[in-house]
Amino acid sequence: MTRPILIAGYGSIGRRHLRNLRALGYKNFILYHTGKSILPDDEILDIPTEHNLAKALAHKPVATIITNPTALHMSVALAAAKAGSHLFLEKPISHTMDGVEDLRRLAKRKKLIVQVGFQFRFHPLLRKIKRLLEENKIGPIVSVQAHWGEYLPDWHKGEDYHLSYSAREELGGGVLLTLCHPFDYMRWLIGEIDSVSAVQSRSGGLKIDVEDSADVLLNFKSGAIGNVHLDYIERPSRHFIHIIGQNGIIHWDNSKPKNFDRNRLFIDEMRHFISCITKSEQPLCSLNDGIATLRIVLTAKQSVKEERLIKLI
């Protein structure tokens, strides 16, 4: 690829993707950021930087890696797609459905690759679980539970978590959006979801203006039922999935095993994205997948407000 790759947003995940692309051998980048990041600039001194999106897109990037706050994703994605740039869109794809269908139509018309950053689809054990389920090793699925609790102030050492997008409603924060991975990998593993019921809490302990815990009940179209628990409170952190089938169970715990680097997931998803562009492959996690997960989250939020079970549209 001779055209540059645009990194739109230079927070912690933008820096990770930049490092990983460099590790994969790519050297031609453009950086678009507002200058509000508190990360040091030493790694980007050699990268042309624009503070205006139109100027950044004037460099004609072959791909745009969208890593700015959730509430700003869609405006950048639409502009980049109009410019003919393939998209790697961090999760969640947005905080509302505004502009989402426009992006879907635009990407289809321009034949653009759009991959969504749900990196757990690249976890070797979750991929093994998917194979086991496809082989019907535990029979029909009866119930599935996912639990993800992680203390928000510990996420990025040296940063004020109050200022992060995860903690701010206007930037698309809160556990339902920020920790939405289980909704994606449950769809991927178990199948489509029919209806959602949710409750949430703003406990006040973290002094943030978004929900810091939530529980979501899911009815799958297959007849299976599920539960997702998310929180910003739990210490030590815990993340697992427990699947009950008619003939057995599967339990996966995300506690770090020996000799496993979680950055492998991010390397593999970025390698896959580049391969999709250069070899015309289809993304393992497509824009349609990202839209489906966003609908689940927004339906959960609606359920909280209306205090009832709601069918997905």
Protein language model features and the residues they cover:
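Contiguous beta-strand/loop segments that form the cofactor/metal-binding neighborhood of enzyme cores
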Residues: 177-256, 267-280
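C-terminal helix-rich "cap/oligomerization" subdomain common to oxidoreductases
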Residues: 63-66, 135, 221, 275-313
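Predominantly a Rossmann-like dinucleotide-binding segment in NAD(P)-dependent oxidoreductases
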Residues: 120-207, 307
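Rossmann-fold dehydrogenase core element
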Residues: 102-120, 140-144
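Beta-loop-alpha module in the N-terminal Rossmann-like domain of NAD(P)-dependent dehydrogenases
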Residues: 47-106
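N-terminal Rossmann-like dinucleotide-binding module
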Residues: 1-44, 59
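Hydrophobic residues in well-ordered beta-strands that form the structural core
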Residues: 89-90, 114-116, 252
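A short helix->loop->beta-strand "cap" motif at the edges of active sites that frequently abuts
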Residues: 26-27, 83-85, 110-113, 224
